[in-house]
C-alpha cells in the first residue's frame, strides 16, 4: 500500500504536536518512526488510522484521501498496549482471534496464519500464560486476518525479552518481504534487526524523513 502524508499539522488544545509533516512511501517500504516520548509518534499513527481528525494537511492510502473518505479495509494495527481485554478474565488465544470482525476468516485460514507466525501450538493457551513475545505474535496474527497491505506497529517490543525481540523482527521482515508496507514506531532502533527502507525522526513536532539502505539503522 502506498502512503502519502502532505503538510500534516495536528495539535491538542493550544499545543501543536505535529508541524507540517510530509513523507511518502511506496508499496513494500518499511518505515521506522523514532523520537523521544511526547514527540508525536503515536499521534501521527492515530492520524493515519483516522482516530485523530486531521484539521490541516492530507493523508492518502493508495491515492485515496482518508481525510475525506475512510480507506482502512486493508490496514492492520498492533498497538503497544492491548487494553481491550481484561487479562484477569480467562481467555484463550483462539477466543481472542474469534471476536469482532476478525472472526470472518475461515478456520483453515486462521490455522495457516498461526502456523506462519509460529504460534500454532499455543492456540488453546490462556493468554495469562503467554510471554510478552508470544502475546505480540497473537496480535500480529489478528491484524493479518484483515489481509493488510499496510501494517502499523506501535512500540511492539516493549517488555519483550531480547531473544523474542530478535524473533519478532525476523517475522516482521518476512511479512515486509511479501510486499506488506510496514510502519513501526520504536524507542530503540538499535535493538532491532529490522530491514528498514526509510526513517522518520520526530522532534518538537517537526520531522526528518530519509531513505536508508536495507538493514542500516544508523
Name every feature range the model reports, one short phrase each.
Residues 107-122:
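Conserved ABC ATPase "signature" region
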Residues 151-154:
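Catalytic Walker B motif of ABC-type/P-loop ATPase nucleotide-binding domains
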Residues 57-71:
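Conserved ABC transporter NBD signature motif
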Residues 126-130, 134:
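Conserved ABC ATPase signature
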Residues 186-187:
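H-loop/switch region of ABC-family ATPase nucleotide-binding domains
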Residues 198-212:
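H-loop (His-switch) and adjacent beta-strand-loop-beta switch element
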Residues 49:
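Helix-to-loop junction immediately C-terminal to a conserved catalytic motif
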Amino acid at each position: 500500500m502506498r502512503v502519502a502524508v502532505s503538510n500534516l499539522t495536528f495539535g491538542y488544545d493550544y499545543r501543536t504536536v505535529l508541524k507540517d509533516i510530509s513523507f511518502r512511501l511506496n508499496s513494500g517500504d518499511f518505515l521506522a518512526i523514532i523520537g523521544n516520548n511526547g514527540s508525536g509518534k503515536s499521534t501521527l499513527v492515530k492520524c493515519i488510522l483516522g482516530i485523530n481528525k486531521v484539521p490541516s494537511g492530507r493523508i492518502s492510502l493508495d491515492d485515496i484521501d482518508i481525510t475525506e473518505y475512510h480507506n482502512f479495509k486493508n490496514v492492520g494495527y498492533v498497538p503497544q498496549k492491548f487494553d481491550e481485554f481484561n487479562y484477569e478474565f480467562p481467555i484463550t488465544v483462539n477466543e481472542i482471534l474469534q471476536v469482532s470482525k476478525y472472526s470472518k476468516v475461515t478456520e483453515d485460514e486462521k490455522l495457516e496464519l498461526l502456523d506462519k507466525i509460529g504460534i500454532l501450538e499455543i492456540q488453546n493457551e490462556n493468554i495469562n500464560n503467554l510471554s510478552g513475545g508470544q502475546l505480540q505474535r497473537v496480535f500480529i496474527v489478528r491484524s493479518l486476518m484483515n489481509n493488510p497491505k499496510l501494517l502499523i506497529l506501535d512500540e511492539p517490543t516493549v517488555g519483550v525479552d531480547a531473544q523474542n525481540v530478535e524473533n519478532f523482527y525476523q517475522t516482521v521482515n518476512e511479512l515486509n518481504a511479501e510486499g506488506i508496507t510496514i510502519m513501526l514506531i520504536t524507542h530503540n532502533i538499535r535493538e532491532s534487526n529490522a530491514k528498514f527502507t526509510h526513517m522518520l525522526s520526530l522532534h518538537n513536532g517537526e520531522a526528518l524523513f530519509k531513505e536508508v539502505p536495507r538493514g542500516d539503522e544508523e
